Every structure is written in C-alpha cells, then in structure tokens.
C-alpha cells in the first residue's frame, strides 16, 4: 500500500461528484459510513464549534453568525403598556472553504458484488488520515487566537512569577488547578456561555499527566454518563471538562519562539459559540473508490484500483473572548516534539 502526498484539489468545491462506476449503492453507503466512523474519533477540535453545512451552489465561502448580547432591561414595566422591545443583532462572518483529499493505491482485484476486505481496510486507513487532517486544520485556526495566558513560573517556595511571552516559560510553568480557575474566571467575566454546564479544555496527554494527579480531579464516570461524554474526554476540575488528544498543539524550537530545549503546549479553553466549523456529514467528507480499469489508457493493464477521500473544510473564530489559549510546559517538555 502506497500513501500519496496530500493535495489541495482545485475543482469547484460545490460539485458533489464521486466516480464509483459499478459500485452498488449499498456498498457505496457502507464505505461512506466506514470512512466517517474512522474519521469521527479524530475530530476532537471541531466538536465544540458552531456547525454549518457545506455550501451548495454558493461558491467557496460559508457564513457563520455571531449574535450580540442584549443590554439589561432595567426599566420597570408600566401596567398595561407594552415595552418597545429590541432587535436581535447578528454579525455575519464569512470564511473560505477549501477542499482537501488523498488516496491509496491497491493492486488487488476489487470485487464489486461484495464488500472487499482490502477496500474496507484502505477505507479505514484513509478515514483516520482524513480525521487527523481536518482536525489539524481546525486546530491551527483556533491556535491563532489572540486571547493568550502564559502559565507562571513557580519557585521552590511556591511563589509565582508572571510570564508575558512564550520564550519566558520554563519547566516550572505547568498547568495547575489555580491556572484553570483563573482562566475559567476570565471566561466568566466575559459572560462566555458554558457548554452543557461547564467550560471545555482541549489539551495534550503530556499536559493532562501533570494535572490529573491533583486531588480535586474528577474522573469522567463520576459526573457524566457514557452517552454524554465528549470524544476524548478524560475528566473535570474546577468546572472545566478536559478533552485529551495527541494532536493538541505542541511548539518547539527557535522557529516557534520556544525556550531552549523545551516544548510548549497550547491548551484551548473554550466556551459556547467561540468558533465555527463545517459539517463532516452531508457531503462534507466523501469516499472515492476507483475500480480496476476505470483509468482507461492511464492504466493500460488494469493494475491499479484506488480508495480515497475528499472533504470541504474551514474553521473560523467567532468570539475571541470566548476562548483562551493557555501556553505551558510539562514534565515531558524536554523530550516532546512539535506537531
């Protein structure tokens, strides 16, 4: 099996064309479902965003809406008099939708009358790749937010020193319960709405290791039923639910302006309505299966079949005050690599 390089397709992203000549509708549905099932667990960063369907015949741009808060209604009502009321103010934010995709080549014969194990395994492999690719695209947008908090330095006597930039971090600048409480307070002060009663933090397993040993840590089974758990959720502390992924941002080296020899982790604290993403279902992510012989003269001996994926994706920050990027080090910072 040979993996091809990632490519950005230049075709019109609104055209929903999948060439699967000869595949039955039943098999096509099966492979589409298998692809999405493999991709879904890797879509950690997109699960808390405002979802928008991909545009149909609407060009390469998608629109998200940001609603302004209403002012307090402090004027007492007069009996029998209807107040003037207010208009709901919405700001439209547009983002460009791009198309991504990749494929693998198979030399085995594709049996179009039954579900083929090789094709299924290839579908699972490209599904995992699709999920990680789309998740990284969303992650990179969210990591570009301007609302940043740097974990303070902690001396041996417990005294803390504020840090004002990434290069100022050192190995003592780890995520603590006190930091979590401060960031939660920042979101509360911004009147940022909670997600199902709590704020959410997406963090790397190396950072999770540092904070899970705190005595106030709650394992997820103690406060949440399995059907209400987020993808990747590991626990809660101080009103913040933590979601773990190895794809959480890790920075390292001079190019990322990191302290010498130490990796820096970007932890995303999120409230409801902080950002928007395109939906994966409904045509946002497609399977493309090409049978042997479908390439014509490009494959004169009918030696190749392919399994691939194609997706439309974008993400957009909608409310900067509703998200905070906390940058910190970890016990694993000396050995962790950038991603």
Q: Model-found features: residue ranges?
A:
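Hydrophobic alpha-helical segments involved in membrane association or supramolecular assembly
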Residues: 64, 124, 128, 201, ...
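N-terminal "assembly arms/tails" that initiate or stabilize quaternary assembly
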Residues: 2-96, 323, 337
């Amino acid at each position: 099996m040979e993996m091809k390089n990632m490519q950005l397709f230049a075709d019109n992203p609104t055209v929903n064309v999948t060439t699967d000549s000869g595949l039955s509708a039943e098999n096509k549905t099966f492979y589409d479902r298998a692809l999405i099932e493999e991709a879904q667990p890797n879509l950690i960063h997109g699960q808390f965003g405002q979802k928008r369907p991909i545009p149909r015949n609407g060009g390469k741009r998608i629109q998200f809406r940001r609603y302004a808060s209403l002012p307090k209604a402090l004027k007492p009502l007069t009996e029998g008099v209807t107040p003037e009321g207010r208009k709901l103010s919405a700001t439209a934010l547009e983002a460009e939708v791009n198309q991504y995709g990749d494929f693998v080549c198979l030399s085995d014969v594709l049996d179009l009358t039954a579900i083929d194990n090789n094709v299924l395994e290839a579908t699972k492999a490209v599904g995992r790749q699709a999920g990680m690719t789309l998740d990284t695209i969303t992650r990179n947008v969210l990591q570009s937010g301007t609302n940043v908090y740097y974990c303070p330095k902690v001396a041996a006597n417990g005294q803390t020193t504020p840090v004002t930039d990434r290069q100022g971090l050192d190995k003592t600048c780890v995520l603590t319960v006190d930091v979590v409480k401060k960031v939660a307070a920042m979101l509360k002060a911004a009147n940022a709405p909670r997600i199902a009663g709590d704020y959410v933090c997406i963090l790397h397993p190396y950072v999770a290791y540092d904070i899970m040993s705190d005595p106030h840590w709650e394992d997820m089974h103690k406060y949440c039923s399995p059907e209400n758990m987020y993808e990747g959720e590991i626990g809660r502390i101080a009103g913040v639910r933590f979601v773990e992924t190895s794809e959480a941002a890790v920075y390292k080296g001079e190019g990322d302006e990191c302290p010498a020899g130490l990796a820096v982790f970007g932890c995303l604290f999120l409230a409801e309505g902080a950002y928007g993403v395109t939906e994966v279902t409904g045509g946002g992510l497609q399977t493309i299966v090409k049978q042997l012989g479908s390439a014509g003269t490009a494959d004169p001996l009918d030696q190749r079949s392919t399994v691939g994926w194609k997706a439309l994706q974008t993400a957009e920050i909608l409310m900067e005050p509703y998200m905070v990027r906390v940058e910190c080090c970890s016990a694993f910072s000396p050995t962790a690599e950038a991603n």
